[in-house]
């Protein structure tokens, strides 16, 4: 839809962090950062015609530990991402097949990332990482359009949910990589496992 928008966004995005190298093998760290992002053009053109999209704000808290030797690396990273007006995928598409988004007032992503790398010899390395997370919208309100037999919009029904999973955000991810090197030749085998995820923010099973 045609738009005539003159919108200004002023952001202050600080970041602070602490890093402690306990010795040559052990390291711990922690950080806090603020990230804000303005809506894209598509958020305006494909959004609700009665209201403009809002800027997204993130408060990111992270802490972790790493261990490293000449043949082994391992680490754990804990994170909590607190969002205000996060722009999330709705599961719907526009007229040309692009994914639609909407603002949700209060949401979060939290979890732990585990990493392991092993290099037992010069020609082989194994890297694996896994993420367990909880990605939720607090007090999600689902707006359901109601049409007549000729697809004319009659009304919009609002359904309140307590806490729902964010669309396209699985609770578990696993990545695995085997890498081989020999006299300038390199090859790798990669695999990924993605846990259960939903195509809408209302956790609809039958889609």
Give residue spans per PLM region.
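Short sequence motifs at beta-strands and strand-loop junctions characteristic
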Residues: 6-12, 53-57, 66, 104-108, ...
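Outer-membrane beta-barrel translocator domains and adjoining extracellular loop/strand segments
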Residues: 1, 40-48, 86-95, 133, ...
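Membrane-embedded beta-barrel scaffold of Gram-negative outer-membrane proteins
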Residues: 21, 27-33, 54-110, 115-119, ...
């Amino acid at each position: 839809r045609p738009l005539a928008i003159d919108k200004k966004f002023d952001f202050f995005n600080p970041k602070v962090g602490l890093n402690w190298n306990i010795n040559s093998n052990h390291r711990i760290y922690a950080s806090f950062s603020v990230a804000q992002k303005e809506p894209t053009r598509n958020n305006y053109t494909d959004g609700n015609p009665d209201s403009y999209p809002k800027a997204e704000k993130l408060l990111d808290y992270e802490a972790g530990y790493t261990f490293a030797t000449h043949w082994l690396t391992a680490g754990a990273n804990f994170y909590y991402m607190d969002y205000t007006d996060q722009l999330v995928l709705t599961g719907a598409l526009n007229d040309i097949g692009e994914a639609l988004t909407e603002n949700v007032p209060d949401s979060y992503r939290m979890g732990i990332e585990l990493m392991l790398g092993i290099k037992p010899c010069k020609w082989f390395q194994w890297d694996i990482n896994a993420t367990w997370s909880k990605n939720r919208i607090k007090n999600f309100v689902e707006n359901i359009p109601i049409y007549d037999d000729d697809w004319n919009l009659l009304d919009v029904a609002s359904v309140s949910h307590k806490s729902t999973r964010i669309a396209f955000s699985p609770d578990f991810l696993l990545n695995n990589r085997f890498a081989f090197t020999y006299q300038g030749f390199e090859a790798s085998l990669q695999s990924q496992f993605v846990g259960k995820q939903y195509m809408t923010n209302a956790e609809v099973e039958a889609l």
